Structures are given as structure tokens and as C-alpha cells.
Amino acid sequence: MPELPEVETLKNSLKDKLIGLIVENVELKRDNLRYKLSPLLATEILNTNILDVRRRAKYLIIDFNNDYSLIVHLGMSGRFTLQSANYKTQKHDHVIFDLSNGEKLIFNDTRRFGMIYSFKTDLLEQEFFNDLGIEPFSDLLTLEYLKDKLQTRKRPIKNLIMDNRVIVGVGNIYASESLHLARIHPDKSGSDLRDDEIENLIKSIRDVLTKAITAGGTTLKDFVNGDNKPGYFTQQLTVYGKEGQSCLSCSSTIIKTKHSGRSTFYCKTCQYRLASFTI
């Protein structure tokens, strides 16, 4: 599933190309993706100018000059790409936006776990994103903030940093990578982290996400940016997907476990932990 770096990469690839264009037509090829598509989607943004393209958590947001915004979640296999006027529709193209420069913005989703909504722009934070935590790069992500969120929670730290009510956008890949960089065992209880570990974890999350964005995200299978190009952070992964391989830091063996049904990868030496944790 695309995480924060992939959506940030998508935003960066589309923003300058879309701002100022008008949506001249919206074609819904089906009436549902993960959830039912609103029939109003085709009318609420019709003949409107694109003012901005931005990101919140793992959502791509396109703002229009009629005070509506388009909210896009890629799900497991979604692709949101800009195509030329002579583009031939593909099998899993579900929503097509015809733009005033002749190009088409295509939402393609093989597994149909993606989501597209239109929503009043000024109500997004209060109503649509009201349950989301803070952004990893926000100045609000401080030792005090994260310590307060962790100190009463006995859950494994990996689960906690993937909880969008705590920090948004840190999915499975980047949680494993960040914890390895911070040398924190993924099973360690959030409430057991020392202040220096919390500060190091915040820095590690930001460092990993920054490198991933610079590399254009991680493409394991489906992700491409708005120009239909894959991400290359896969080549920089240190533990994720490396089960049985040697740790690049200490040469110990990378271990694979499960947290809430998700694969977790860590180094048994760099991320050594005395006590066990029952999940």
C-alpha cells in the first residue's frame, strides 16, 4: 500500500502540471471502488479551476476554485497518472478526468481498494480528517507530544508509530526501516521508551521518509508517480523484505515476524531486546 513518501512523490509529480487547469469532464467507468462513488463527483468539480495539489497523511488532495476538494486514496494498487490526449483507456481505468489542456488524469486500480471523494475544502480537517494525528515533518511532533502519546500505551512501538491517530503516513515499510535506524526493537512497549529513544525515533522517522521521498518512493509492485514512473527507494531498504539476509550494520541475520498480521523485519543484534512482548 502506498505510504506517505509515495503520495508525496505523486503530489510533487502532479502539482505544477495541474494547477490552473480546468476539469472539463469526469467519466465514472464504474459506480464503486472500495466504497460507492458519489454520482455528484462528476458535477461538483466540473468546469472548475485547479488551485492546489497537496497531501494529508496518505491522501492526495486537489483543491478547486469552487471551494470543493477531490480526495484520493490509492488503496493497495491505485495509480493516478497524467496521460496524453490520445491515451487509450485500459481495463482498470475507473475514473477519467478530461483537462483543459487536452490531457487526461486517470485513476486506475486493479484491486479496487482505492477511494475518491469530493468534499467541501473548509470542512476537510474538521470532518474528513478529524481522527488523524500529526504529520511526521510537523513542528508539533516533539518529544513531549510523542512521550504523552506513548506513556500510557503498552502496545508494541511498531504498532504505535503506524497508528494514524498518533503519527500519520508511517506505514509498514517505513516503520520497520525507522525502527532499525533508531535501533529500537519493534516489540518494545511504547510506554517503555526512554526520552533519548523517543527523540532518536522521531529523527529516524524523518530521515527515512526524507530519503524515500528523494528516491521517489518505494515500488514493490504497483506504485508509480503521476508521470507513470516507479520509485527507487527499494534499492535503499535495510531490513524490509530482507529476511535471512545479513544486516548492513552488523552482519547479523535479519528476522521476520508478524505484528497485527503485517510482516515486520528487524536485526536481532542492532535492535536487541531483553524482555519479550506478547502480541
Swiss-Prot record:
Binds 1 zinc ion per subunit. GO terms for molecular function: 8-oxo-7,8-dihydroguanine DNA N-glycosylase activity; class I DNA-(apurinic or apyrimidinic site) endonuclease activity; damaged DNA binding; zinc ion binding. It comes from the Bacteria. Monomer. Its cofactor is Zn(2+). Belongs to the FPG family. A zinc finger (FPG-type) spans 238-272. It comes from Rickettsia massiliae (strain Mtu5). Keywords: DNA damage, DNA repair, DNA-binding, Glycosidase, Hydrolase, Lyase, Metal-binding, Multifunctional enzyme, Zinc, Zinc-finger. The active site is at P2 (schiff-base intermediate with dna), E3 (proton donor), K58 (proton donor), R262 (proton donor). The keyword ATP-binding does not apply. This is Formamidopyrimidine-DNA glycosylase. It catalyses: Hydrolysis of DNA containing ring-opened 7-methylguanine residues, releasing 2,6-diamino-4-hydroxy-5-(N-methyl)formamidopyrimidine; 2'-deoxyribonucleotide-(2'-deoxyribose 5'-phosphate)-2'-deoxyribonucleotide-DNA = a 3'-end 2'-deoxyribonucleotide-(2,3-dehydro-2,3-deoxyribose 5'-phosphate)-DNA + a 5'-end 5'-phospho-2'-deoxyribonucleoside-DNA + H(+). It holds the Pfam family zf-FPG_IleRS. Involved in base excision repair of DNA damaged by oxidation or by mutagenic agents. Acts as a DNA glycosylase that recognizes and removes damaged bases. Has a preference for oxidized purines, such as 7,8-dihydro-8-oxoguanine (8-oxoG). Has AP (apurinic/apyrimidinic) lyase activity and introduces nicks in the DNA strand. Cleaves the DNA backbone by beta-delta elimination to generate a single-strand break at the site of the removed base with both 3'- and 5'-phosphates. Its EC number is 3.2.2.23, 4.2.99.18. InterPro entries: DNA_glyclase/AP_lyase_DNA-bd, DNA_glyclase_Znf_dom_DNA_BS, Formamido-pyr_DNA_Glyclase, FPG_cat, MutM-like_N-ter, Ribosomal_uS13-like_H2TH, Znf_DNA_glyclase/AP_lyase, Znf_FPG/IleRS. SUPFAM superfamilies: Glucocorticoid receptor-like (DNA-binding domain) (SSF57716), N-terminal domain of MutM-like DNA repair proteins (SSF81624), S13-like H2TH domain (SSF46946). DNA binds at H92, R111, R153. GO terms for biological process: base-excision repair.
